[in-house]
């Protein structure tokens, strides 16, 4: 835990309007920490995942992908992160990969 950069609660409206299906971050939580409100813990998650159906990946090591994109100047790729097929689960380890 602890403080971390991340998305503000206000980004939810933008993500929804742009029909973003999934996001990944290199931090332990996709939303900014500490919480923007003391009313609830991780309010961004409470809306993004169960209400919007947004798929969220956290603690991704994006260094290699970032370096490869910077080297060739191409920032488009197919990204896949298949999860374990666990009925009723809300989270799973993944095996992510990017194909440039």
Regions found by a protein language model. Name each.
Residues 1-100:
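Active-/binding-site microenvironments in catalytic and ligand-binding cores
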